[in-house]
Amino acid sequence: MSKRKADLEVSAGGIVFRWVPEAPPRYLLIRDSYDNWGFPKGHLENGESPAEAAIRETAEETGLSRLVLQGPIRVIDWHFRFRGRHIHKYCHFFLFESPEGEPCPQVDEGITACQWRTLDEALDVLSYDNARGVLKRAGEMVRTLVAIGAGRPLRRTD
């Protein structure tokens, strides 16, 4: 008996953060139609790089148009079944900074809400364990931006 191989899918998504005066940065979460909290992501279109797909999907699903790419976070993968198919999905995540504060969920794609949360709040409400690992790494990257002077400090020091 031979095992059927999984169908491969590749997607890309974004972890968006913004600076808040005199407070820790906020991270953007989206809620899907199943009431799961996660991050914007979607399939790569023909000829699109993972970074291009991440910025497109993040902008589409959140309504944020002024996203600044800070760098790749990591690639995660998981297996699932959909309509009788066994799928092995890879998702490339990228870190984005946004100067905009009011996201607008893409309701026609099943996004029911967008919320800015602190790192700890976001870690508490995320619905998927593998998303927590991505967010923790994003938080480390933001702390590094602050440490090297490429980002705004979390608190004023003067």
Regions found by a protein language model. Give the residues of each.
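Unchanged
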Residues: 43-133
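Short connector loops at helix/strand junctions that flank enzyme active sites
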Residues: 9-12, 34, 88-91
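A short gly/proline-enriched turn/hairpin at secondary-structure junctions
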Residues: 38-41
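Short, solvent-exposed loop/turn segments that connect beta-strands within catalytic domains
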Residues: 20-26, 83-86
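Acidic, metal-coordinating catalytic segment for phosphate/diphosphate chemistry
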Residues: 1-22
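Charged phosphate-binding loop/patch that engages nucleotide di/tri-phosphates or the phosphate backbone
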Residues: 124-158
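Short, acidic/hydrophobic/Gly-rich beta-strand patch recurrent on exposed beta strands
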Residues: 28-31
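Conserved beta-strand and immediately adjacent loop positions that scaffold enzyme active sites
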Residues: 13, 26, 113
